[in-house]
Amino acid sequence: MSNDRYKSIEHRVVANGSKDRVSVPIFMNPRADAILGPLPEVLESGEQPLYKEVVYSDYFKYHLSKKHEGKKTMEPKYSDTTVKAISTVSSVLSKLCDSYISSNQYAPRDPNSEKIIDFVVNKRNGVKGLVDAGIQTVPELYILPVDERLEPNKILTTDSIPVIDVSNWDDPVVTESICEAAGKWGFFQIINHGVPLEVLDAVKEAAHRFFGLPSEERSKYWAGNSPTETVALKTSFVPQAETVLEWKDNLSFRCSPRDLESFPLWPPVCRDEVVKYMESAEPVIRKLLEVLLKGLKVEEIDEAREYTLMASPLVNLNYYPRCPDPDLTAGVGPHSDISTITLLLQDDSGGLYVRATDEDSWIHVPPVNGALVINMGDILQIMSNDRYRSIEHRVVANGSKDRVSVLIFVNPGADAIFGPLPEVLESGEQPLYKEVVYSDYFKYFFSKRHEGKKTMEFARI
């Protein structure tokens, strides 16, 4: 950060032949998703940066992927402003940390892709900036291998996920329908849920307003540059770990009661609508969890269990700008969510597909006016010992218009420990998963590109 004004010096410790020795270091570290590089104040006189911007979790994992080697972790240094191939970092991590970072199956990035990375990620323009710049073709960096594209012959038109009327939560037919859909499909839509239509429309309009701001206004909230850690603008999924980027930008809001204290620092064009939507959706979240947990023989959600289920909600405003050739790229690649449950509000564009039960096909989830799409996350699949299913889903890009969606990820507290519920195992059933700290699961998910349900192997016995 000091551009070499301050020195991080090698040090070592010798063993002791006469007595035991202890020491207690305190490492003052950045957040895992913090982006670090030379400070703007250091470079304001025109001084050239010696280091590129790096996500701390990538730097951390590279450091722990090898033996102590002096100051080797700090290499390479750069003497110009060109950001070198981030895929090189991904390649190194793949070779040295195969157990942690997924293998890189794509070719190295070409020089033009490096320029795209610089513009989209490092200059904080996002894919929205590319579209605003007038690109007419999809850059190579966004083009999927042929075998990863969603071909028409893979779309199943004879099946659909259920649409459930929840106007009477106490109706046994409603509760049975929810639990059945959670077990068979992992996805369902709910209507008559109680969130006012005007609240749903307002938060979608707010998403369009934010992404309609000039780039210099949007970039004020870029992850690592935002005035608060509770709001972060990002692009794709994890660009530093991806060799093909996703055609999406998103603005994330951490919405726990403590996080809401930083509300005045959130973007004025959308903060009121985000909070109103979260407040309106909370009763729905609680009813859904109550029904789903009762289906697992949990009669009461006490304070400790509530922390494990829903302590850290996250609201995402996802933005998919119009794409010149949507068949070549992905809005979001196939993945399952690392939430307990997720609530998705679609606009009228469509484009969400879920994995069919035959595992080789995909089912479109058509927008239903006023509906919320509900899907099970990995956490609930693990807690249910596979009774409920966290299903892969993906989003295709749109060639005719900009698309927005609004998600609420209902997440555990960072230090919550989760595993199969005792109520599920009380009859002697064997657990399929070990107990895991949520922050560890979260970090593993964000250490790699979207890879279907591979994250669940982190917890599987």
What are the roles of these predicted feature ranges?
Residues 1-461:
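Peripheral, non-catalytic segments flanking oxidoreductase cores
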